[in-house]
Amino acid sequence: MPFAELLGIDVKNAARDEVRAQMAWSERLCTTAGVMHGGALMALADTAGAVCAVLNLPEGAATSTIESKTNFFRAVREGHVDAVAHPLHVGRTTIVVQTDLYDATGRRIAQVTQTQAVLSSGGSGGTAGGGRL
């Protein structure tokens, strides 16, 4: 996952029912005020959520994010961010994943809910490798 590598995202654990990933605070991922940029946080959540969706795909299927909603609760000014993704719905045409983001002290800083399309092997996905990570 080249974009995830660019951001320094490290997938710590990946299973069908839970994916855990982490991203370190870095000045290059911040706004001018030293706060981690919301787009970086959303990219962390999208990465963990997409991995969760891929692990729940039927054999030969691919996926692409078709909807994502983020609620931000706190700013991150240091440390790292942990992402914990769980599938809320695994269906024939969509997979819905909820990803909670936590700061280094364990406080929830954001919650992301995303919907992933389940694409047949003949479909065109937005994820590199035909929707498989």
Segments predicted by a language model, with ranges:
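Non-catalytic linker/capping segments at the edges of enzyme domains
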Residues: 1-22, 127-133
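Short connector loops at helix/strand junctions that flank enzyme active sites
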Residues: 4-6, 16, 36, 48, ...
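Short, small-residue-rich loop/turn micro-motifs
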Residues: 23-27, 116
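A conserved, well-ordered hydrophobic junction motif at loop->secondary-structure transitions
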Residues: 26, 30-44
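Active-site helix/loop of acyl-thioester processing domains in fatty-acid/polyketide metabolism
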Residues: 39-62
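HotDog/MaoC-like acyl-thioester-processing domains
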Residues: 57-59, 76-78, 82-133
